[in-house]
């Protein structure tokens, strides 16, 4: 029901609190699931106080119940346990605080947990979070390895010692977190996000040395699975629990059976790599020697041929052939030049004999009128007294027509 309010007609805080309490009262009793993060049982008190938390969304709510309700499950429930409670929501108006009053509390059994994990597994698989094509390859030689593990844990020691034994120069960026219990999910998620944000981190290892199914529940939490799926950095899961692998094993880019196995898969062994380099050098040396031996045999075979016993003989034979060809060329060229010279002399003699200069040398003269016209007959000589130019072999002179 919408409330008709305005800045001029607001509702008092008490009225708002009363209305909220009325809405909550109409909810009735509901079943709620969560993880017990705080448990307070005061001696002599008839009421037990609990805090239920949803680890996937980091939301908590206070729960109260009568001691006789809690005593029925007190031996099997501790902080960190998952329970379902039948409770009536209550609104405490003076403080504006919501709480639950439980009338029944039941621990969540391992069988039920496994069923829920299987359902979550199928749901995430349907989204493609476990697909092989999403897996990122690990670098051959990471310069900086991010490690998420419990403080001073065997898992931390196994990863650090084995990795440094294999490759002493490897460096680690370690984030110590809770690896079980109510705070594990939030701390592991934060650590993974911090390491993924560091550009120099080449690979992230999330390690824990095994444990019960209940202890490993944080590593199947949906929030953590989605965080790992969103990482740009390759992630290695090293939880170390073979029968029932947590969902982290499926979303990680590589699964290691134990923290020690993770160290072996993350960094190469310096001894093995040196041996591999030596093997490659030996193989290259054998290949080069084989090539040299083959070329030496080929050279020896070539030198053993008859032509190579007296190599100058081929040159001498070709030199004689060249000399013969040069002599022949000189003779042919000389003959051609002599014939050309004879033909040129003959042609020159004919040209000279046909030249007007030869006629003039025999005493003849050529008469030309002043306009250059050659006189070929007496009629062309012109009138008496007209000058003519006479050309002879040694020059020319002027004459005049006489009658």
Swiss-Prot record:
GO terms for cellular component: cytoplasm; exodeoxyribonuclease VII complex. Keywords: Cytoplasm, Exonuclease, Hydrolase, Nuclease. The keyword Hydrolase applies. One of its GO terms (biological process) is DNA catabolic process. InterPro entries: Exonuc_VII_L (IPR003753), Exonuc_VII_lsu_C (IPR020579), OB-fold_nuc-bd_dom (IPR025824). It is found in: Cytoplasm. It is an enzyme of class 3 (hydrolase). Its main location: cytoplasm. One of its GO terms (molecular function) is exodeoxyribonuclease VII activity. It catalyses: Exonucleolytic cleavage in either 5'- to 3'- or 3'- to 5'-direction to yield nucleoside 5'-phosphates. CDD domains: ExoVII_LU_OBF (cd04489). Its EC number is 3.1.11.6. Transmembrane segments: none annotated. It holds the Pfam family tRNA_anti_2. The keyword Nuclease applies. NCBIfam families: xseA. Belongs to the XseA family. Heterooligomer composed of large and small subunits. Bidirectionally degrades single-stranded DNA into large acid-insoluble oligonucleotides, which are then degraded further into small acid-soluble oligonucleotides. HAMAP family: Exonuc_7_L. This is Exodeoxyribonuclease 7 large subunit.
């Amino acid at each position: 029901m919408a409330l008709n309010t305005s800045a001029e007609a607001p509702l008092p805080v008490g009225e708002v609190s009363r209305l909220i309490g009325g809405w909550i009262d109409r909810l009735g009793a509901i079943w709620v699931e969560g993880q017990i993060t705080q448990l307070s049982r005061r001696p002599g008190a008839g009421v037990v106080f609990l805090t239920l938390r949803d680890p996937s969304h980091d939301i908590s709510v206070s729960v109260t119940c009568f001691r006789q309700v809690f005593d029925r499950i007190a031996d099997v429930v501790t902080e960190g346990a998952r329970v379902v409670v039948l409770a009536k929501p209550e609104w405490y108006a003076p403080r504006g605080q919501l709480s639950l009053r439980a009338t029944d509390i039941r621990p969540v059994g391992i069988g039920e947990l496994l069923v829920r994990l299987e359902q979550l597994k199928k749901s995430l698989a349907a989204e493609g979070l476990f697909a092989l094509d999403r897996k990122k390859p690990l670098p051959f030689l990471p310069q900086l390895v991010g490690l998420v593990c419990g403080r001073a844990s065997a898992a931390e020691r196994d990863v650090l010692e084995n990795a440094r034994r294999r490759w002493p120069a490897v460096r680690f960026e370690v984030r110590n977190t809770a690896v079980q219990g109510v705070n594990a999910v939030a701390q592991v998620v934060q650590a993974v996000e911090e390491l993924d944000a560091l550009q120099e981190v080449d690979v992230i290892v999330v390690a824990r040395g095994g444990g019960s199914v209940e202890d490993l529940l944080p590593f199947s939490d949906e929030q953590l699975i989605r965080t790992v799926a969103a990482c740009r950095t390759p992630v290695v899961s090293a939880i170390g629990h073979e029968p029932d692998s947590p969902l982290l094993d499926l979303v990680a880019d590589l699964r290691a059976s134990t923290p020690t196995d993770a160290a072996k898969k993350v960094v190469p062994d310096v001894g093995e790599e040196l041996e591999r380099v030596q093997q490659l050098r030996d193989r290259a040396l054998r290949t080069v020697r084989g090539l040299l031996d083959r070329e030496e045999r080929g050279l020896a075979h070539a030198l053993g041929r008859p032509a190579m016993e007296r190599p100058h003989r081929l040159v001498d034979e070709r030199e004689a052939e060249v000399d013969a060809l040069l002599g022949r060329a000189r003779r042919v060229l000389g003959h051609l030049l002599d014939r050309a010279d004879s033909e040129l002399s003959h042609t020159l003699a004919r040209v000279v004999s046909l030249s007007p200069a030869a006629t003039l040398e025999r005493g003849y003269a050529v008469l030309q009128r002043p306009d250059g016209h050659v006189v070929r007959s007496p009629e062309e000589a012109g009138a008496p007294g007209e000058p003519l130019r006479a050309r002879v072999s040694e020059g020319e002179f002027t004459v005049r027509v006489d009658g």
